[in-house]
UniProtKB/Swiss-Prot annotation:
EC number: 3.2.1.99
Superkingdom, natural source: Eukaryota
GO CC annotations, alphabetized: extracellular region
Lineage, broadest ranks: Eukaryota, Fungi, Dikarya, Ascomycota, Pezizomycotina
Primary role: Endo-1,5-alpha-L-arabinanase involved in degradation of pectin. Its preferred substrate is linear 1,5-alpha-L-arabinan.
Signal peptide: 1-19
Name recorded for this polypeptide: Arabinan endo-1,5-alpha-L-arabinosidase A
SUPFAM superfamilies named in the record: Arabinanase/levansucrase/invertase
Thermal characteristics: Optimum temperature is 50 degrees Celsius.
Pfam family of the protein (one): Glyco_hydro_43
């Protein structure tokens, strides 16, 4: 979820909690940025996707690993005719009617000239992916949003695409299928009114009677050359609603469209800047929050970021790791 670097607004820091669990174990190939996780229906094999190398991906027998690198989803680059179409970002995986869909973003750092594309495969094996190009969501400087960081929610027979990074922050649009929008207008579902609007990387997850909108906020990248003030680095936040299409509020009742958001996971111990998250209902561990983070004992460079995961406790109605 590359974006403009910025500071997290002071209002969003309210409610910061401590005592987070350390990340679960990871062995094998554990360096990732913006991970996406899915398990193959036919055999239970785990697949993990990441920003870079035309969407790199790896497989393992469990979420712990050992992770083995496979290759790239779109090795020739996206057919979307925009700068950045050979350096794809922010994968998101879904499974619909026997087919796996991998969303990706085409953009360049700090630009609104962006689009969300999709590739599909029935097996997720190397060289089986078909690139379909744009899903119909794109942006330029004339838009209120930046069309990156797509996330598809499959809710029964309905499909919703969450997307956005900075500018107008998080938007949603109805999809006709995992491949194309329904042609309706997009609408804002989360917005930080302060600073340069540091929200991105949304992930909408249904659990029980609520839809939980997870997102990353703060400065994401480049920590090896310049680190933000304490508390202004990446962190994972959430709002919830009984509707998939809006009305998201934080734990204090603040609207997510009015700078609301409850912190789920922030820097702690040797874990720094967790973000780029998703949620998966694991058959062994139950709901799991996965993300990338910096291990401060290893290094702060983007290519040193690691795959992290924690189980989520929803018993209070709010996610706790």
């Amino acid at each position: 979820m590359y974006s403009l670097l910025t500071a997290l607004s002071v209002p969003l820091l309210a409610g910061l909690a401590h005592g987070y669990a350390n990340p679960g174990s990871c062995s094998g190939s554990c360096n990732v940025h913006d991970p996406a996780l899915i398990v193959r229906e036919s055999d239970g094999k785990y697949f993990r996707f990441s920003t870079g190398n035309e969407i790199s991906y790896a497989s393992a027998s469990s979420i712990n690993g050992p992770w083995t690198a496979i290759g790239s989803v779109v090795p020739a680059g996206s057919k979307i005719d925009l700068s950045g179409n050979t350096d794809l970002w922010a994968p998101d995986l879904s499974y619909v009617d026997g087919t796996y869909y991998c969303l990706y973003s085409v953009s360049t750092f700090g630009s609104q000239d962006s689009a969300i594309g999709v590739a599909s495969s029935t097996t997720m094996e190397l060289n089986t992916w078909t690139d379909h190009g744009s899903v119909g969501v794109a942006s330029s400087s004339s838009k209120n949003y930046n069309a990156i960081d797509g996330n598809l929610l499959v809710d029964g027979s309905s499909y919703y695409l969450q997307f956005g990074s900075f500018w107008g922050d998080i938007y949603q649009v109805k999809m006709a299928s995992p491949l194309k929008t329904a042609g309706s207008a997009s609408y804002n579902i989360a917005y930080n009114a302060t600073g340069t609007h540091s929200e991105e990387g949304s992930y909408l997850f249904k659990y029980g009677s609520y839809y939980y909108l997870f997102f990353s906020s703060g400065t994401c990248c480049g920590y090896d050359t310049s680190r933000p003030a304490q508390g202004e680095e990446y962190k994972i936040m959430v709002c919830r609603s009984t509707s998939a299409t809006g009305g998201f509020v934080d734990k204090n009742g603040n609207a997510c469209t009015e700078s609301g958001g409850t912190i789920v996971l922030a820097s702690h111990g040797t874990v720094y800047g967790p973000g780029g998250q998703g949620v998966y209902d694991d058959p062994t561990y139950g709901p799991v929050l996965y993300y990338h983070y910096v291990d401060t004992t290893i290094g702060y460079a983007d290519d040193q970021k690691l795959f992290g995961w924690n189980t989520i406790d929803f018993s209070s109605g709010w996610p706790v790791v």
